[in-house]
């Protein structure tokens, strides 16, 4: 979680005092740099592995550790340096740098507008149908519900940040409608989590689900009722919640341990195992 907090801070800090660089623009720039780095690293790793395998098979034997070390260098050294080289330098607020940061490649634009957004819309319909058909009874304590709702909130948040710079009617509809749908979904998830806590206590996994529910609720409100240039407000909130989850006395494992101990004590007392 500390590394995750540092990564979010890495995206957020350059946008704090720069009105021309909102959070969603830098998020898009970092996303493009990350995807490009992953693609380049995979291609390079595949090429190096193929060359070493060919040498081992056709010419002379090569220790398998050579391949592992080569992949290690590509994955950690090359990928890190290449990723940092793609991160925009906003120190001088060069217009060309700002333009490149906010530019959405045609491939990514088509992928988001004509593939990702329709898929999210269909997934929303399926999720709503599942809730409408099965609501009531054991529905609220179903193990399947929490992962579905959490994954939906993550997808909507990421897609929203990526499509903010795209001028298209589908993108604009997504920005207007889906944050409000996400707010309703998060409320469902919060109710489901609270009901499961009453039966099973707090586990470390459910602790993170609750924290994510808090974050998603605030995020949905910001996306729904604030301008998209205010999207950076979600970054410090996410960082604070992430740090809380690893802080002494209130971290996930401490809270879940105390909760499970209390559940066991209550169960033992009800069965007269403890006097």
Q: Residue ranges of each PLM-predicted region?
A:
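Generic alpha-helical transmembrane segments
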Residues: 2-11, 78-80, 146-160, 182-188, ...
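Membrane-helix interface and helix-disruption motif detector
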Residues: 1, 57-71, 130-148, 193-208
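Internal/C-terminal transmembrane anchor helices
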Residues: 229-252
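Membrane-interface segments at or immediately adjacent to transmembrane helices
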Residues: 247-275
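Membrane-interfacial loop-to-transmembrane alpha-helix junctions, especially the N-terminal start
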Residues: 25, 29-42, 108-116, 142-148, ...
């Amino acid at each position: 979680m500390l590394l995750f907090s540092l990564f979010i801070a890495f995206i957020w800090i350059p946008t704090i005092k720069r009105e021309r660089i909102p959070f969603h623009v830098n998020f898009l720039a970092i996303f493009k740099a990350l995807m490009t780095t992953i693609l380049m690293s995979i291609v390079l790793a595949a090429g190096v592995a193929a060359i070493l395998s060919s040498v081992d098979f056709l010419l002379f034997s090569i220790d398998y550790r050579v391949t592992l070390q080569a992949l290690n260098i590509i994955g950690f050294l090359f990928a890190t340096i290449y990723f940092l080289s793609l991160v925009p330098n906003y120190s001088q607020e060069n217009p060309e740098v700002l333009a490149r940061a906010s530019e959405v490649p045609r491939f990514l634009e088509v992928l988001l507008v004509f593939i990702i957004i329709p898929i999210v819309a269909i997934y929303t319909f399926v999720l709503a149908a599942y809730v409408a058909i099965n609501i009531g009874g054991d529905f609220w304590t179903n193990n399947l519900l929490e992962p579905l709702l959490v994954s939906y909130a993550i997808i909507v948040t990421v897609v929203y940040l990526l499509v903010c710079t795209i001028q298209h009617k589908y993108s604009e509809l997504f920005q207007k409608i889906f944050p409000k749908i996400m707010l309703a979904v998060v409320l469902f998830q919060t109710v489901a989590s609270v009901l499961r806590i009453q039966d099973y206590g707090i586990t470390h996994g459910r602790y993170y689900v609750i924290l994510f529910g808090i974050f998603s609720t605030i995020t949905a409100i910001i996306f729904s009722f604030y301008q998209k240039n205010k999207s950076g407000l979600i970054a410090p909130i996410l960082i604070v919640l992430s740090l809380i989850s690893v802080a002494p006395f209130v971290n996930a494992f401490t809270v879940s341990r105390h909760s499970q101990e209390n559940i066991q004590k209550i169960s033992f007392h009800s069965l007269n195992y403890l006097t």
